Amino acid sequence: MTSTEILSKIERYCAYQDRCTQEVVTKLRSWQIEEQEQRQVLQVLKNDGFIDDERYVQSYIQGKINAKQWGVQKIKLGLLQKGISKNLIDKYIKDINPEQYTDNIQASIHKWTQNHGPVTQENIIKLYRHLMAKGYTYEEIKSVELKTEN
């Protein structure tokens, strides 16, 4: 592949949805592009606005909060696995709307109870495990559960 073909192909890849730097590097490696050419392509993509890790972090967080109703812990882990710096993650994690976050926990509890019946002593551990797997902390779950009971 020529440099122009590579650039054209990777621009389409980035235009389809927001991509972080690591995703683009992985794609370029899968095409067996040399290290020096990878750096040049990445620089062009960043200059042209095809790659922007800050924009990626913002859209990732909003997508996981709104669509998947994930908790902060799972979002952080997902971003760290994509090679995003902890400082950048922390910068945008604090922008999460606390009311929406609490509503997401309540909605997850409601959905779980529709599938598994009311929360009882026997199945409360399963509920907590489910919510913690979605990335919520024990304290967050407990505070929402107490509000729901009162």
Model regions: which residues?
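An alpha-helical, amphipathic repeat domain used for nucleic-acid recognition
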Residues: 1-150
